[in-house]
Design a protein with these regions (language model features):
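C-terminal motif of bacterial Sec signal peptides marking the signal peptidase cleavage site
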Residues: 18-20
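WD40 beta-propeller blade core
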Residues: 126, 172, 212, 257, ...
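Blade/loop signatures of beta-propeller domains
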Residues: 30-48, 53-90, 266
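Extracytoplasmic beta-rich repeat domains
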Residues: 61, 90-110, 138-156, 182-199, ...
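Structural signature of WD-repeat beta-propellers
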Residues: 71, 120-121, 150, 159, ...
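Short loop/turn segments that connect beta-strands within beta-propeller blades
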Residues: 129-133, 175-179, 215-219, 261-264, ...
Length: 439
């Protein structure tokens, strides 16, 4: 194939001519797609021919005021938040130290009714107005951690507390109104996941595949549960999921446990491991994407190439699909949107896991030399658009109904954490530590 077909455009889709930008209104940064050409890349996953003619239908977008956990709520399920059809940059602010080779930015912001909370790679917590980005307070936790930074962890907020986990193994519970440390505990083991707040308890998952439940007010250990320890894992970790008194925890070993939220006893368990010798990256059974609960069904994806749906109460497998990835699936109504490890954005039926459509995203900055792999993060469904962020500075929107490319902007800085949305505003945190608000 001639060089004419190799290009440095924003997003490659497999089946569609690119249309004019329909999401972002910042004209100075809009990507001009009028000269773009589609590179004919074959997708790994194929649409199921039995679903030809099936129309994707979504519930009406609803304004959500908060994003309290790293993936909005303890069930990791928000359905369809509202944003305007066209959004533009409302404000931008630097929240602290950006990432370096040792310390990537992995923690998404969390948002309550009035404020947005962030953490940088030096464990500085910032509380800002979600309306205009004005800083309300800052708190440096650096004296409590080692000098190399936090290396994973994350944030969660409720009506009273802001909970912070750090990669160095320390959990902090802060007064969210002023940043005062109410209590902290050193677990002496790396924490790679954000905390999950459920009622009066907080769930903490550590690198050694141990889940602990603590009382938020009394700093009391409620219970612990342990899975098999795994040597080969990805940076970061999935977070527990909670619904109807059941805690779902997925370990890097591929194990899935349903636990009683009150005492940690096992209700049922499963395993996504392929039971093969792990000699390559593709064989790692690590579950990095968060398990999602919707309508008493559980959806889990592993890197090794398995995505499954289970009955929440019994653990019975309802279906499985040969799709692997590290991003959290977005489940809404009867459909699932997921970004695979092959940079394919896929729409599946939540009933049987059959593929409805597939769109290929660009893999490399330089396709001919296959250099500089692009990491895509997402998707985020908002305002009838699927939003994905690229490590090359491109934020793109794709139709959830067809997989067609809608538009993109170049923010000229890598985004490697999941975008969040609250009160008609989409927030992006760049690797340089800049928080961008689009509304």
């Amino acid at each position: 194939m001639s060089k004419f077909f190799y290009f440095l455009t924003v997003v490659i889709t497999t089946f569609f001519l690119l249309t004019s930008c329909g999401l972002f209104k910042d004209k100075e940064k809009d990507i001009d797609t009028s000269d773009s050409r589609v590179f004919p890349v074959e997708t790994v996953v194929k649409p199921d021919q039995s679903l030809r003619g099936i129309k994707v239908s979504l519930p009406k977008p609803v304004i959500n005021k908060t994003w309290m956990q790293s993936t909005n709520n303890e069930a990791h399920n928000i359905q369809h938040p509202f944003v305007n059809n066209k959004i533009r940059l409302a404000w931008k602010i630097n929240i602290g130290k950006g990432q370096n080779k040792k310390n990537p930015i992995t923690s998404q912001p969390v948002i309550d009714e009035t404020n947005i909370y962030t953490i940088d790679t030096k464990a500085k917590i910032v509380s800002l107005s979600k309306v205009n980005g004005k800083i309300k307070w800052e708190k440096k936790l650096r004296k409590k951690i080692d000098r190399d930074g936090i290396l994973n962890g994350g944030l969660a907020v409720n009506e009273k507390y802001l909970v912070v986990t750090t990669g160095t193994g320390i959990v902090f519970v802060l007064d969210k109104e002023n940043g005062k440390i109410l209590w902290d505990i050193d677990l002496s083991i790396t924490i790679r996941a954000a905390p999950i707040i459920s009622g009066n308890s907080v769930l903490i998952l550590t690198k050694d595949n141990r889940l602990s439940s603590y009382d938020l007010q009394e700093k009391k250990l409620n219970w612990t549960h342990e899975g098999l320890e795994e040597i080969s894992t990805f940076m970061g970790s999935s977070m527990p999921t909670v619904s109807n008194g059941i805690v779902i925890v997925t370990y890097s070993s591929g194990e899935i446990y349903a636990l009683n939220e009150l005492n940690g006893s096992v209700i049922w368990n499963d395993n996504l491991s392929l039971y093969i010798q792990k000699q390559s990256l593709d064989n790692i059974s690590d579950i990095r994407g968060n398990p999602v609960i919707n309508d008493n069904k559980l959806y889990v994806i592993s890197y090794s190439g398995k995505m499954i749906s289970l009955d929440l109460n019994s653990g019975i497998r309802l279906w499985e699909s040969n799709i692997g990835g590290i991003q959290t699936p977005w489940v809404v109504s009867r459909f699932i949107f997921v970004l695979s490890k092959d940079n394919e954005l896929i729409c599946l039926s939540s009933k049987d896991g059959k593929v409805i459509w597939v769109s290929k995203l660009k893999d490399f900055m330089d396709f001919e030399k296959k250099e500089k792999n692009i990491l895509w993060t997402g998707p985020l469904l908002a305002g009838r658009m699927l939003i994905v962020s690229g490590s090359h500075g491109i934020i793109a929107s794709i139709s959830p109904y067809s997989g067609k490319f809608l538009g993109a902007i170049n923010i000229k800085s890598s985004v490697e954490t999941h975008a969040v949305v609250a009160d008609r505003t989409v927030f992006f945190l760049t690797v340089g530590g800049d928080l961008l608000a689009y509304r």
